[in-house]
Amino acid sequence: LVFRVMKINQNGFREYDARWLFEKDIDLEGITDLGKGLGTQIIKHTKKTNPRVIVGQDYRSYSEKIKKALTEGLVSTGCNVEDVGLALSPMVYFAQFNLNSDAIAMVTASHNENGWTGVKMGIKKGLTHAPEEMSELKEITLNQKFTTGKGSHKNIDDFKKIYIEDLVSKNKINKKIKAVVACGNGTAGIFAPEILRGIGCEVIELDCELDWT
Protein backbone atom coordinates (compact mmCIF):
# COMPACT_ATOMS: atom_id res chain seq x y z
CA LEU A 1 0.00 0.00 0.00
CA VAL A 2 1.16 3.52 -0.82
CA PHE A 3 0.07 6.18 1.63
CA ARG A 4 0.00 9.76 0.44
CA VAL A 5 0.46 12.39 3.14
CA MET A 6 -1.82 15.30 2.32
CA LYS A 7 0.09 18.47 3.01
CA ILE A 8 -2.80 20.83 2.28
CA ASN A 9 -6.45 19.81 2.50
CA GLN A 10 -8.45 21.72 -0.11
CA ASN A 11 -11.45 21.88 2.24
CA GLY A 12 -9.52 24.34 4.39
CA PHE A 13 -10.15 27.09 1.87
CA ARG A 14 -13.36 28.66 3.13
CA GLU A 15 -15.45 31.57 1.84
CA TYR A 16 -13.69 34.34 3.76
CA ASP A 17 -10.52 32.79 5.21
CA ALA A 18 -8.63 29.51 5.54
CA ARG A 19 -8.68 27.02 8.45
CA TRP A 20 -6.99 23.68 9.01
CA LEU A 21 -6.12 21.29 11.81
CA PHE A 22 -2.36 21.76 11.93
CA GLU A 23 -0.38 18.65 10.97
CA LYS A 24 -3.55 16.63 10.23
CA ASP A 25 -4.85 18.79 7.36
CA ILE A 26 -1.81 20.91 6.59
CA ASP A 27 1.91 20.83 7.36
CA LEU A 28 4.57 23.53 7.24
CA GLU A 29 5.35 22.79 3.59
CA GLY A 30 1.66 23.27 2.83
CA ILE A 31 1.70 26.59 4.70
CA THR A 32 4.69 27.70 2.62
CA ASP A 33 2.76 26.80 -0.53
CA LEU A 34 -0.14 28.87 0.79
CA GLY A 35 2.29 31.78 1.21
CA LYS A 36 3.48 31.30 -2.37
CA GLY A 37 -0.12 31.25 -3.58
CA LEU A 38 -1.02 34.36 -1.63
CA GLY A 39 2.13 36.17 -2.75
CA THR A 40 1.38 35.32 -6.38
CA GLN A 41 -2.17 36.61 -5.96
CA ILE A 42 -1.03 39.84 -4.28
CA ILE A 43 1.48 40.54 -7.06
CA LYS A 44 -1.20 39.90 -9.68
CA HIS A 45 -3.71 42.26 -8.07
CA THR A 46 -1.34 45.05 -7.05
CA LYS A 47 0.70 44.83 -10.27
CA LYS A 48 3.82 45.35 -8.14
CA THR A 49 6.99 43.25 -8.28
CA ASN A 50 7.69 43.72 -4.55
CA PRO A 51 4.43 44.47 -2.74
CA ARG A 52 4.61 45.13 1.01
CA VAL A 53 2.71 42.60 3.12
CA ILE A 54 1.97 42.94 6.86
CA VAL A 55 1.99 39.65 8.82
CA GLY A 56 1.14 38.86 12.45
CA GLN A 57 0.13 35.87 14.54
CA ASP A 58 -2.05 34.90 17.50
CA TYR A 59 -0.87 33.25 20.72
CA ARG A 60 -1.08 29.55 19.88
CA SER A 61 2.02 27.49 20.63
CA TYR A 62 2.62 26.78 16.94
CA SER A 63 1.50 30.08 15.34
CA GLU A 64 5.00 31.58 15.20
CA LYS A 65 6.42 28.71 13.13
CA ILE A 66 3.36 28.79 10.87
CA LYS A 67 3.90 32.51 10.31
CA LYS A 68 7.55 31.81 9.50
CA ALA A 69 6.59 29.16 6.92
CA LEU A 70 3.97 31.48 5.41
CA THR A 71 6.55 34.29 5.26
CA GLU A 72 9.01 32.03 3.42
CA GLY A 73 6.38 31.48 0.74
CA LEU A 74 5.53 35.17 0.45
CA VAL A 75 9.18 36.22 0.20
CA SER A 76 9.89 33.59 -2.49
CA THR A 77 7.38 35.29 -4.80
CA GLY A 78 8.89 38.75 -4.33
CA CYS A 79 6.82 40.12 -1.44
CA ASN A 80 8.48 42.38 1.12
CA VAL A 81 7.11 41.11 4.42
CA GLU A 82 6.76 43.39 7.45
CA ASP A 83 6.16 41.42 10.64
CA VAL A 84 4.28 43.08 13.52
CA GLY A 85 4.57 39.96 15.70
CA LEU A 86 2.01 38.86 18.27
CA ALA A 87 -1.21 40.61 17.33
CA LEU A 88 -4.97 40.81 17.27
CA SER A 89 -6.54 40.67 13.80
CA PRO A 90 -7.73 44.32 14.03
CA MET A 91 -4.16 45.39 14.81
CA VAL A 92 -2.97 43.85 11.54
CA TYR A 93 -5.79 45.57 9.63
CA PHE A 94 -4.81 48.86 11.33
CA ALA A 95 -1.17 48.30 10.37
CA GLN A 96 -2.10 48.16 6.69
CA PHE A 97 -3.45 51.72 6.95
CA ASN A 98 -0.84 53.02 9.37
CA LEU A 99 2.13 51.64 7.43
CA ASN A 100 0.42 52.03 4.03
CA SER A 101 1.16 48.45 2.96
CA ASP A 102 -0.30 46.55 0.01
CA ALA A 103 -1.76 43.50 1.78
CA ILE A 104 -2.08 41.61 5.07
CA ALA A 105 -1.90 38.02 6.31
CA MET A 106 -2.87 37.22 9.91
CA VAL A 107 -2.12 33.73 11.24
CA THR A 108 -5.10 32.86 13.45
CA ALA A 109 -7.90 30.35 13.83
CA SER A 110 -9.96 32.90 15.81
CA HIS A 111 -12.25 31.17 18.32
CA ASN A 112 -11.40 27.63 17.15
CA GLU A 113 -9.89 25.39 19.80
CA ASN A 114 -6.22 24.49 20.12
CA GLY A 115 -4.95 22.40 17.22
CA TRP A 116 -6.49 24.62 14.57
CA THR A 117 -4.66 27.17 12.50
CA GLY A 118 -5.60 29.47 9.66
CA VAL A 119 -4.96 32.71 7.85
CA LYS A 120 -7.05 35.83 7.37
CA MET A 121 -5.95 37.66 4.24
CA GLY A 122 -6.66 40.94 2.49
CA ILE A 123 -5.32 43.07 -0.34
CA LYS A 124 -7.49 46.18 -0.62
CA LYS A 125 -7.36 48.27 2.56
CA GLY A 126 -10.14 47.42 4.99
CA LEU A 127 -11.27 44.37 3.02
CA THR A 128 -10.48 40.72 3.71
CA HIS A 129 -10.72 38.01 1.06
CA ALA A 130 -14.25 37.29 -0.13
CA PRO A 131 -15.38 34.06 -1.90
CA GLU A 132 -14.01 35.19 -5.28
CA GLU A 133 -10.52 35.89 -3.89
CA MET A 134 -10.54 32.68 -1.84
CA SER A 135 -11.48 30.63 -4.90
CA GLU A 136 -8.65 32.22 -6.88
CA LEU A 137 -6.16 31.62 -4.04
CA LYS A 138 -7.22 27.97 -3.78
CA GLU A 139 -6.73 27.45 -7.52
CA ILE A 140 -3.29 29.10 -7.56
CA THR A 141 -2.10 27.23 -4.46
CA LEU A 142 -3.33 23.72 -5.24
CA ASN A 143 -2.06 23.92 -8.83
CA GLN A 144 1.23 25.49 -7.68
CA LYS A 145 1.04 28.29 -10.25
CA PHE A 146 3.54 30.39 -8.34
CA THR A 147 5.40 33.54 -9.28
CA THR A 148 9.07 33.61 -8.28
CA GLY A 149 10.90 36.71 -7.15
CA LYS A 150 13.21 38.13 -4.52
CA GLY A 151 11.42 39.56 -1.52
CA SER A 152 12.51 40.52 1.97
CA HIS A 153 11.50 40.23 5.62
CA LYS A 154 11.79 42.71 8.47
CA ASN A 155 10.34 42.98 11.95
CA ILE A 156 8.31 46.04 12.94
CA ASP A 157 9.22 46.46 16.60
CA ASP A 158 6.78 47.82 19.19
CA PHE A 159 3.84 48.13 16.79
CA LYS A 160 1.53 47.01 19.60
CA LYS A 161 2.36 50.28 21.36
CA ILE A 162 1.44 52.33 18.27
CA TYR A 163 -1.88 50.48 17.95
CA ILE A 164 -2.82 50.92 21.61
CA GLU A 165 -1.81 54.60 21.67
CA ASP A 166 -3.96 55.28 18.60
CA LEU A 167 -7.01 53.64 20.18
CA VAL A 168 -6.56 55.36 23.53
CA SER A 169 -5.97 58.81 22.01
CA LYS A 170 -9.23 58.67 20.05
CA ASN A 171 -11.49 57.20 22.73
CA LYS A 172 -12.12 58.62 26.19
CA ILE A 173 -15.08 58.06 28.52
CA ASN A 174 -16.32 60.55 31.10
CA LYS A 175 -18.52 58.19 33.11
CA LYS A 176 -16.58 55.90 35.42
CA ILE A 177 -17.06 52.31 34.30
CA LYS A 178 -15.82 49.22 36.10
CA ALA A 179 -15.06 46.49 33.57
CA VAL A 180 -14.34 42.83 34.26
CA VAL A 181 -12.07 41.75 31.42
CA ALA A 182 -12.01 37.98 30.86
CA CYS A 183 -9.56 37.11 28.09
CA GLY A 184 -9.36 33.32 28.44
CA ASN A 185 -5.54 33.49 28.57
CA GLY A 186 -5.54 34.44 24.88
CA THR A 187 -3.94 37.23 22.87
CA ALA A 188 -6.47 39.85 23.99
CA GLY A 189 -4.99 39.64 27.49
CA ILE A 190 -2.05 41.85 26.53
CA PHE A 191 -4.30 44.38 24.78
CA ALA A 192 -7.75 44.76 26.34
CA PRO A 193 -6.87 45.69 29.95
CA GLU A 194 -4.34 48.34 28.87
CA ILE A 195 -6.68 49.84 26.27
CA LEU A 196 -9.66 50.00 28.64
CA ARG A 197 -7.57 51.57 31.40
CA GLY A 198 -6.26 54.05 28.86
CA ILE A 199 -9.74 55.26 27.92
CA GLY A 200 -10.74 55.65 31.56
CA CYS A 201 -12.16 52.36 32.81
CA GLU A 202 -11.45 50.68 36.11
CA VAL A 203 -10.36 47.19 35.06
CA ILE A 204 -10.63 43.90 36.91
CA GLU A 205 -8.54 41.30 35.08
CA LEU A 206 -9.63 37.68 34.77
CA ASP A 207 -7.41 35.14 32.97
CA CYS A 208 -5.43 37.85 31.17
CA GLU A 209 -2.06 36.10 31.44
CA LEU A 210 -0.91 34.51 28.19
CA ASP A 211 -1.15 30.72 28.38
CA TRP A 212 -1.54 28.59 25.27
CA THR A 213 -2.34 25.40 27.19
Task: Please describe what each predicted stretch is.
Residues 6-72, 76-77, 156-177:
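An N-terminal, well-structured beta->alpha segment
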Residues 1-5:
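Short, Lys/Arg-enriched N-terminal segments with co-localized hydrophobic residues
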Residues 117-213:
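Gly/Ser/Thr-enriched, mixed-charge loops and adjacent short helices
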Residues 16, 57, 107, 181-184, ...:
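Active-site flanking residues adjacent to catalytic metal/cofactor-binding acidic residues
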Residues 26, 87, 109, 208-209:
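Residue-level "edge-of-site" marker
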